[in-house]
C-alpha cells in the first residue's frame, strides 16, 4: 500500500499494522487520515482500499458548472452548492464564492457578473443565496417541501413562501417605493395593508406575514434580492440551458437578438413587448396574454404609467404634460408658442425649422398626432419642475387618468418635423385620384415653350433628343387603358408622398419633376438658392419671371425677348400650370439635360447623371430694371467676406441672374417601367 492510503477512511487495526510494515513506519500520520472527497459528499467504502479510478462500476461524480475560488486554486473537484463541502470542512464557508474564469477575447469588456451561469435554469442571485439558512448537511435549504426538478424552472414554485415573478394581477401603485434597479442598496418595502389586491393568486394564499418586504425573515423569503434585474433571462422567457453557450453573457445576448427580431412585426398588443419597456419602481410589469394566459413582459397592467427606473421626476419630464391628459405626446416637450411655452416665438413660426426631442421613456414611442381630441400641451418649465419635486413619492395624481400609448407599431411611427405637419394620410390618394393625368397636353405645352424661348438650332437639338424616346413611350402606353392610367397617377402621387418627407428632412436643394419636366415638389433650400417661391414653382401663383439667362436690358447688347408665362397660362384657362424644369436652366444646360434624359429614360434604371449647370434666378421686370444700380453693391459685398447665411445665399446670381451649380439627378420609373418622375439635387459651387 502506498502513501495514498492517508486519503482513505480509517481501516481496522490489523490492516493499519500491515500498512505500517509495508510503508516503513509512516508513524502516527496514518492514525488520522484526511478525507478529500467533495462535491457529492460520497466517501470511499471503509474497506481499507482506495477505489480503482478505472472501475466502470465506480460511482461518477457530477462535474460542477463552476468551481469555487478555493477549489479552483487547489485544482480540486468542487460542487454546485455554495458553500461547497470542501469549504465547509475547512471552515471557509463564509468566503466560498465562484471562481473567476479566464475570459475569452470577445468578452474582455464584459462585466464579471454578466458571465455568471444560471443554476438549473434559474437566475443566480448572490443576495438570495447569502440570505438562505444552512441545513444540517451544509446545503442551502430554500424550502423543505420543495421537490427537486431536473428541468429548467423559470417560474417559482407555489410551495415556497416567495413572491411570484410573473404576476397575474395588477400591482398596487402605492405598494412599493424603490430606487434604481441597478442601485447597490435597492430594496423593496411593502405596506401589509395595501397588498390585498396587488399580489398574485398564489401569494394571496400565503399567511399575512409573508410579503416582499426587505425586512422579512430570509428563511421565509428566498427572493430577498432585487425584485427586478435587467440581466435576468427569466424576464424574457430565455431558456439559457437550451442554448449551447459556455457563458451567460453570450447566451443572453443571442437570446435578446432573437427576441428583438421576432418582435419586429408584432400586433399592437405586443408593441410594448418589442420595446422592452421598464415598469414602475424599477420592477417588471406583466399581464396575461389572450392566447396562452401566461404572463408577458413589458405590458403596463391596468393602464398604469410606467416609470423610468422608478423616478417620478424623470417620468413627468418624459411625458411633458399634466396627469389629466389621456395620451402621451412627443411634441409635448416643445409645445407651440402661446401655450405656456418657454420657447421664443420666432422659433415656432410655420416656416422655421424645428428639432424634435428623443426621450428615454415609453412616451417616445407615441405617435405625434395620435390623439383623438384637441388638447393643450404644456412645456417643461420651472413651475412644472417645482411642482413635480413637491409631489408625492409615486408622482401620480390620485384622481387623474393614466396616459396610454397609442402607437400601433414602431415601423409605422411618424416623426413630427414641425408645426406644419401633413395632416393627410396615404389612403386619401387612392380616394381622390379619379382622372388620369393629361401628359399629352403637358408635352404640347412644353413644345410650345421650347419653340418660343430657344433659338431654332437649340430647339432642333432638344427635339431630336425627345424624338429618340418617343417610340418607347408609344410602345409602353399603347396597351394601357383608362384604369391603368389612373393607377399610374396614383403611383406617382404615392411616391411623391414619400419624397416630400425626404425633402423636408434633407438640407440639400431638391426638386422633383414629372417626366414632362413640370415641377411637382420642391424643398425650402432650393427656393432660398434660386429665389423661386414654392407656390410659383407648383403653379399656385402667377409666374412673373423674365430672366432667361440673356444679357441685362440696357447693357448695349441684343437679347432675345421673352414673354412671361402669363400668356402660356392663358392657353389653359382655369387650371394652374406648374413651372417647367427648362425654365430654371439656361439654354446650354437645358440642351444637355434633355440629351442625358433621352439616354437615361429607358436605359439604366439605376443610373444617374452628375454634372454642372447654371440655374436662373427668379427676377421680375422690376428686378431687372434695378439690377444695374445694384451691381456696385454686389461687387463690394463679395470683397467683404463671401457668402454667409440665408441672406448670402439669396445674393448668389445677383449680378448676371445665373448660379453656377453642380447637380445630380436620376429617373424613377413606375410599375409599367415608364419614366415617372425626376429627382434632382443641386448645390452651388460658389459656397465655401
Curated annotation (Swiss-Prot):
Residues 547-559 have a biased composition (Low complexity). The keyword Transcription applies. Residues 1-61, 137-162, 174-228, 264-302, 547-574 are annotated as: Disordered. Its main location: nucleus. Residues 29-40, 174-222, 268-290 have a biased composition (Polar residues). GO terms for cellular component: nucleus. GO terms for molecular function: DNA-binding transcription factor activity, RNA polymerase II-specific; RNA polymerase II transcription regulatory region sequence-specific DNA binding; zinc ion binding. One of its GO terms (biological process) is positive regulation of metabolic process. Coiled coil: none annotated. Transcription factor which regulates nonfermentable carbon utilization. Activator of gluconeogenetic genes. This is Transcription activator of gluconeogenesis acuK. It comes from Aspergillus oryzae (strain ATCC 42149 / RIB 40) (Yellow koji mold).
